[in-house]
Design a protein with these regions (language model features):
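Extracellular/periplasmic bilobal clamshell ligand-binding domains
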Residues: 204-216
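Periplasmic-binding protein-like
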Residues: 1-4
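C-terminal capping/gating helix-and-loop segments adjacent to ligand/active sites or protein-protein/ligand interfaces
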Residues: 189-202
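Conserved functional loop/turn residues at catalytic and ligand-binding sites
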Residues: 48, 107-108, 125, 150, ...
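A ligand-binding cleft/hinge motif common to bilobed small-molecule-binding domains
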Residues: 6-17, 75, 79-84, 106, ...
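Short acidic active-site motifs
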Residues: 99-100, 118, 207
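Hinge/capping helix and adjacent helix->loop/strand transition within the periplasmic-binding protein
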Residues: 7, 12-99, 146, 157-192
Length: 216
């Protein structure tokens, strides 16, 4: 079994950078759907997204963003923000989300795009300026959506899907599908997931297959 991350999984395939295709895998379930947010350091000069955008437009290319690598979900989020708001920035890719957000907290960059679970253990060290969703997040009711501010008005984030190799027998897929559903309905699991900032979102095998197709 393994995880795939949408939309990165499909983006890598569509750009010809993968040695596999969508048909190389058999979907089991979707585990988590995470919403992207715009982050700055807690003591940043930017208190609103409008502050950040104004600075970026007044100082083309000077604003720096840490990302988790080219074409990764957080890099896509930063690109979407810059495109929809109409500014230039300098992208600094790191080896992963942990390093990306460490750079933000150490003041090496001005902003980042990440998911809530990515910074759940150090929320006091960052400020959330906006969320990529049609509605405000329950955990951040005072933080506006991008659409409210006149920018990108759709959901953006990551869906974490569990898959098996193509050709895995249907009874095996069904076994794991049922097992993960049972796990994700467990009260202790749900409590732990909430504490970690995870947005659990179980989808069965058929619905996960449809989700993967939708993101192509």
């Amino acid at each position: 079994l393994g995880f795939i991350n949408l939309p990165n999984f499909n983006a890598t395939i569509s750009e010809g950078l993968a040695t596999y295709t969508v048909d190389s895998f058999a979907p089991i379930c979707n585990h988590v759907t995470e919403t992207s947010v715009v982050l700055v350091k807690a003591d940043s000069q930017f208190n609103t997204l409008e502050d950040l955008v104004k600075f970026a437009k007044d100082n083309p290319g000077k604003l720096k963003a840490s990302t988790n690598g080219n074409r990764a979900s957080n890099h896509i989020g930063a690109q979407v923000l810059a495109t929809s708001a109409g500014f230039e920035y300098t992208d600094i890719p790191y080896g992963g989300t942990a390093d990306q957000l460490l750079a933000l907290r150490q003041g090496e960059v001005d902003f980042s795009v990440a998911k809530v679970a990515d910074f759940a253990s150090f929320t006091s060290e960052v400020k959330v300026l906006a969320v990529y969703n049609q509605e405000r997040l329950a955990g951040y009711p005072d933080v506006p959506t991008m659409g409210e501010l006149g920018y990108y008005d759709q959901w953006l984030g990551s869906s974490r899907c569990i898959v098996a190799p193509a050709g895995t027998p249907e009874n095996v897929i069904k076994f794991y599908e049922d097992a993960f559903q049972k796990l994700m309905e467990d009260a202790d699991y749900l409590k732990a997931a909430e504490a970690a900032g995870m947005e659990t979102d179980y989808k069965n095998s058929a619905d996960t297959a449809a989700l993967i197709k939708q993101k192509q």
